[in-house]
């Protein structure tokens, strides 16, 4: 098996408005020192760009793709159909259906084209970054250490926070 080194995470989203949610994924990845990039690629408005991006992702040293999409949310599934790289889908919360439409679109992929589907909105973006970091950490001891420390700090925050019963 040829293991690729120095893999990065690519965060893609269907529109600029999705960045409000997806920037949280970027912030987590930067805290963990995971190399990442951010791109706006629409499955509907820029399908040729999406196609080219997905086909070149492995050559561009992408190890995990986090794809955020709202509404019909085809971006994660279409990217997953075009690459062997793990794709994590983040449903973006919408005004009309609160992201339920996006969640169902991303989660209900046909067998053979998996998309790891996270929670709707900000929690999903954060967890997608942590999951992507975990995947990259399998071949990167520095990121593995950063992720371990991050999780330990989350535990410490819980124990040092004031009790609501006090």
Show which residues each predicted segment covers:
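Glycine-rich phosphate-binding loop
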Residues: 53-91, 95
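N-terminal beta-loop-helix "entrance" segment that forms/cooperates
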Residues: 41-58
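Short glycine/serine/threonine-rich phosphate/pyrophosphate-binding segments
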Residues: 18-22, 47, 72-78, 97-100, ...
